[in-house]
Design a protein with these regions (language model features):
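Compact, Lys/Arg-rich rRNA/RNP-binding cores from ribosome-related proteins
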Residues: 2-92
Length: 92
């Protein structure tokens, strides 16, 4: 793997749009927002974004009805088996 195949950044993901959903779906939708935001900014498909459990725990920390308004994640993009993959973990 060459250095051009690896990229790591700390990204702030806005989750305010999750409040447009019904209260029973907000945390679920917030996880989808994180996955979509990282896929867009790292130029990969949403299926190629792997979220660490720490991201899930941070979204669900206040319960299903009240996800945080924004979330900072440390994301790394690299090539695995010829396909670009993004792995993300919660950045405190």
């Amino acid at each position: 793997m060459s250095t051009s195949d690896f990229e790591e950044r700390v990204v702030t993901v806005p989750l305010r749009d999750a409040n447009d959903k019904p209260v029973q779906q907000r945390a679920d939708y917030a996880v989808k927002i994180v996955r979509g935001h990282l896929a867009k900014h790292f130029s990969v498909d949403e299926e190629d974004v792997v979220l660490d459990t720490s991201v899930n725990e941070a979204v669900w920390a206040n319960g299903r009805q009240n996800p945080p308004s924004k979330l900072r994640v440390r994301a790394a993009r690299f090539v695995e088996d010829g396909d670009p993959v993004v792995e993300a973990e919660y950045a405190e």
